[in-house]
C-alpha cells in the first residue's frame, strides 16, 4: 500500500533499531482517510473468505479494525486488557506480551460475541514478534471459530513475527513491510 508506506517513511519516528513510533497517524492521532484506505485494502485481500468478524486488541488495533469491519459490513470485536465489571462470566482469555511496552496483559473476549460459526480476520497495527496475533488466534480457537487470516498494518520484517504466525498455520497479509530501522531511517522491504 503505497500511501501507507509514504506515511510511515515521512511521519514515522525511529526510536531505536527495533521501535518505530507512528503516533501521528495510527497509535495516538488517527488519520481517518488513511485508515479507511487500510480497511478497504484488507477488504480487497480477504473479500472472498466469508469473514463474519474482525478481531483486534485494544487500543491501537481498533482504528484499522473498525475501518475493515465497515468495508466487510461485519462486527468489529476487540479483546479487552481488563475485565469490565459488567462481564461476570462467559469469556475467553489469554496472555499477550507487548513488544513495545515490554509488558504481559491478560486479554478477554466475551463468549457472547465469538462462536464456532465465526470466520475471523485478526487485524493489528504492528507485527513484531507476533505475540498479539498468536494470542488472538488462541482466543479464536477457544471459541471453536476459524481464523481466516491476519491483517497487519505495519510489519517489522526484520523480526520473527511473520515466521511465528506462518509456523502456526496463519496466512499473513501486511500492508507495509519495514526492512530496517538502522541509521535512524525507515527502509521499506524492496528498497535499496
From Swiss-Prot:
Keywords: Cytoplasm, Glycosyltransferase, Purine salvage, Transferase. One of its GO terms (molecular function) is xanthine phosphoribosyltransferase activity. Its main location: cytoplasm. SUPFAM superfamilies: PRTase-like (SSF53271). GO terms for biological process: purine ribonucleoside salvage; xanthine metabolic process; XMP salvage. Pathway: Purine metabolism; XMP biosynthesis via salvage pathway; XMP from xanthine: step 1/1. It is found in: Cytoplasm. It catalyses: XMP + diphosphate = xanthine + 5-phospho-alpha-D-ribose 1-diphosphate. Disulfide bonds: none annotated. Xanthine binds at residues 20, 27, 156. The keyword Transferase applies. Belongs to the purine/pyrimidine phosphoribosyltransferase family. Xpt subfamily. Converts the preformed base xanthine, a product of nucleic acid breakdown, to xanthosine 5'-monophosphate (XMP), so it can be reused for RNA or DNA synthesis. This is Xanthine phosphoribosyltransferase. It comes from Staphylococcus epidermidis (strain ATCC 35984 / DSM 28319 / BCRC 17069 / CCUG 31568 / BM 3577 / RP62A).
Amino acid at each position: 500500500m503505497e500511501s501507507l508506506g509514504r506515511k510511515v517513511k515521512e511521519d514515522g519516528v525511529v526510536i531505536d533499531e527495533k521501535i518505530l513510533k507512528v503516533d501521528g497517524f495510527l497509535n495516538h492521532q488517527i488519520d481517518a482517510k488513511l485508515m479507511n484506505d487500510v480497511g478497504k485494502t484488507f477488504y480487497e485481500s480477504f473479500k472472498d473468505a466469508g469473514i463474519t468478524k474482525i478481531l483486534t486488541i485494544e487500543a491501537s488495533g481498533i482504528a484499522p479494525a473498525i475501518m475493515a469491519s465497515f468495508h466487510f459490513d461485519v462486527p468489529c470485536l476487540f479483546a479487552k486488557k481488563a475485565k469490565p465489571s459488567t462481564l461476570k462470566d462467559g469469556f475467553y482469555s489469554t496472555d499477550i506480551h507487548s513488544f513495545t511496552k515490554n509488558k504481559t496483559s491478560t486479554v478477554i473476549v466475551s463468549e457472547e460475541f465469538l462462536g464456532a460459526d465465526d470466520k475471523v480476520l485478526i487485524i493489528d497495527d504492528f507485527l513484531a514478534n507476533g505475540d498479539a496475533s498468536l494470542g488472538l488466534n488462541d482466543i479464536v480457537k477457544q471459541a471453536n471459530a476459524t481464523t481466516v487470516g491476519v491483517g497487519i498494518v505495519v510489519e517489522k520484517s526484520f523480526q520473527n513475527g511473520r515466521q511465528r504466525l506462518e509456523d502456526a498455520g496463519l496466512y499473513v497479509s501486511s500492508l507495509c513491510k519495514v526492512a530496517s530501522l538502522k541509521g535512524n531511517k525507515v527502509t521499506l522491504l524492496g528498497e535499496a
